[in-house]
Amino acid sequence: MRKPVIAGNWKMNMTCTEAIEYMRVLIPLLKDIPKKDREVVIAPPFTALYPLSEFIRDKNDCLSLSSQNVHWEDSGAYTAEVSPLMLNELSVKCAIVGHSEPRKYFSESDEQINKRAKSAQDHQLIPIVCVGETFQQREMGEAERVIRRQIEQGLEGIEVKKLIVAYEPIWAIGTGKTCEANEANRICGLIRKWIGYEDVIIQYGGSVKSNNIDEIMSMSDIDGVLVGGASLDPTNFARIANYEKI
């Protein structure tokens, strides 16, 4: 049985004060979600992880925190990076790796993403490994080849039972364009086949909103969502977390 994971990636948004106020609104709106039914994860900026880890402690069983990245070394001369040991101290549960923005802006390779994912697992963090194609790659009929390469190289040596994969078609991130639910479901099914483990959690990400979440979560091979901009409003994100299958 695959338990859905609804994750909100705040990216470079929210001060610590804003993050706490956000949680004051969000937590009461999640009170009717049983832990056994689904999990809700928030990935704030690194600066907000400590105050949020203290604030949400013992407040909601289904709510946990994720980092937006993690380095493969425990410490060292890696300016602007965060180590898995630092995240362990904050009771962080997950770590996003391979998001399209670091891939694009910082030229992150599948090899680096693989090292980050392994480091996360070695330190009892669940990596949320992001994969997805550009619009040009999709138009040229290369989407499946690109995603399969990202899966094979990014997940080499990874324990698939302790993993979340997020399919994020890059052309749908922050653009308002959403991959059709049936097509997203088809790709997620292929990812499951390529990984070779039926119970791996596979999320969809890309312009997920409160008005399309019910349809997305009704798909058989989609086990959750990784939400960007729509997660910045607590009421809106609560509606997404409280989805109802069609």
Curated annotation (Swiss-Prot):
It comes from the Bacteria. It is found in: Cytoplasm. Pfam families: TIM. Substrate binds at residues 9-11, 174, 207, 228-229. SUPFAM superfamilies: Triosephosphate isomerase (TIM). Keywords: Cytoplasm, Gluconeogenesis, Glycolysis, Isomerase. GO terms for cellular component: cytosol. GO terms for biological process: gluconeogenesis; glyceraldehyde-3-phosphate biosynthetic process; glycerol catabolic process; glycolytic process. Pathway: Carbohydrate biosynthesis; gluconeogenesis; Carbohydrate degradation; glycolysis; D-glyceraldehyde 3-phosphate from glycerone phosphate: step 1/1. It catalyses: D-glyceraldehyde 3-phosphate = dihydroxyacetone phosphate. GO terms for molecular function: triose-phosphate isomerase activity. The active site is at residues 99, 168. Its EC number is 5.3.1.1. HAMAP family: TIM_B (MF_00147_B). Involved in the gluconeogenesis. Catalyzes stereospecifically the conversion of dihydroxyacetone phosphate (DHAP) to D-glyceraldehyde-3-phosphate (G3P). Homodimer. Belongs to the triosephosphate isomerase family. PANTHER family: TRIOSEPHOSPHATE ISOMERASE (PTHR21139:SF42). This is Triosephosphate isomerase. The lineage of its organism: Bacteria, Bacillati, Cyanobacteriota, Cyanophyceae, Synechococcales.
